[in-house]
Amino acid sequence: MSYKLWDILGEMKSAEYEWVELSHSLNNDSPYWGGIPEGSVELGKVCYDWGNPMLECIIHTFKFPGQFGTHIDFPAHFIKDGKTSEYYGAEQLMFPLCVIDVTAKVAEDVHYAVTVEDIKEYEAKYGPIPDGAFVALRTDWSKNWPSMDAISGIAEDGSENFPGWSMPALKYIYEERNAAANGHETLDT
């Protein structure tokens, strides 16, 4: 028996393609943005454990905000009445990927915020960001994971210091290029 989608999946899993893991495990040691209200995060609490007479299995609960750790943002996070993840549906959650690499600029300035000019430089090299794209920001900030202090960029005065997106850049990708989502390696945009 053969199905076209299985064939496509088989091809995608072949040596012709490289799969890159971009996620981190979530647990109570996972770093997250310090502005999240107290009590909003509870990761990996065991609600059923082995030996429970009612249900012989292990079940964990996870409670956390949608913008937690490194994450994906949809237009509604920045654009009032913008699209949320629910808008897209499962069949649309595969997007063309565009990666704006600003690692060199971040190495010079920890507070660097990607600009419209950075995006236009990307487009001059690779072509326009396609409609419905996932636009990711590469800063190499993920190399600070899993240290809460390092990934937060916490200074001696308690301030958080890390790179991110500028609002004009976000408006450009969402309003001018109709991006579906954006991503970044830091705990906040």
Language model features with spans:
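Active-/binding-site microenvironments in catalytic and ligand-binding cores
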Residues: 1-189
